[in-house]
Design a protein with these regions (language model features):
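Short S/T/G/P-rich N-terminal loop/turn motif that feeds into the first structured element of a domain
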Residues: 1-50, 54-177
Length: 180
C-alpha cells in the first residue's frame, strides 16, 4: 500500500471552500480509478488543509498522478502557497472496523509527522514496534477504525490512525504515546 499526504496553507476564509471542492469535485473524479483505495481531506488542527490518498502501490499512484493534478488544479486559487507532499510505502497497518465509502459519518484523523527515528533505529524498527506493540494494544479500544505507518526514508516516516471521533482518539492517547 502507498500513501500520499498533502499539507497546504489556505487563504483566509477559504478552508470550507477547499474541503467542499475536494468532496464535490476531486473525490468523484476518482471513482473507478484503478489502484485507488481511498481519498479524504480535513482541516488540520494547525489550520492547514490536509488531504491524503491511499493506493494499492506506488505504481498505481504514479499512473493516476496526471488525473490527480488536474482534479486538484481548481483548488489552487484557495491556497496561500505551494502544497507540501509527503508520500511513502505503508510498512505497517491494521484495520479494526470496515467503513463503507458511501458512509455519511465523519471521523477523526490523527497524523504523526515525525522528524526521524532515535539514533541507531530505522523506520523498520518503528514499523515492528507499531505492529507488535501498538496495534495489539488497540485491539479492544472503542472507536478506532484503523491505523498505519508509512516509510518515507530509512529513518523517517509518518503514522496515522482514524477514529469515530475526537473523544475516542483522546481516550486512547496514552496507548499511542509509547516511544521506542
Amino acid at each position: 500500500m502507498f500513501v500520499r499526504l498533502t499539507l497546504a496553507d489556505v487563504k483566509e476564509g477559504e478552508m470550507n471552500n477547499a474541503l467542499e471542492y475536494v468532496e464535490n469535485t476531486v473525490i468523484p473524479s476518482y471513482d473507478g480509478v484503478p489502484g485507488l483505495l481511498g481519498v479524504a481531506a480535513c482541516a488540520a488542527n494547525d489550520g492547514r488543509f490536509m488531504a491524503w490518498s491511499t493506493w494499492a502501490n506506488e505504481e498505481a499512484k504514479d499512473a493516476s498522478i496526471e488525473k490527480f493534478n488536474q482534479a486538484l488544479a481548481g483548488a489552487g486559487e484557495m491556497l496561500a502557497g505551494q502544497p507540501v507532499v509527503t508520500e511513502g510505502t505503508m510498512v505497517a497497518g491494521q484495520q479494526y472496523v470496515a467503513v463503507s465509502k458511501d458512509g455519511e459519518e465523519g471521523f477523526f484523523a490523527r497524523f504523526v509527522l515525525g522528524g526521524g527515528t532515535q539514533e541507531g533505529k530505522t523506520y523498520d524498527d518503528v514499523a515492528d514496534f507499531m505492529t507488535n506493540t501498538v496495534y495489539p494494544a488497540y485491539e479492544n479500544v472503542e472507536g478506532i477504525y484503523g491505523t498505519g505507518a508509512c516509510k518515507v526514508a530509512e529513518d523517517k516516516g509518518f503514522s496515522f490512525n482514524f477514529w469515530t471521533n475526537h473523544d475516542a482518539a483522546h481516550a486512547a492517547s496514552d496507548l499511542s504515546l509509547i516511544h521506542i
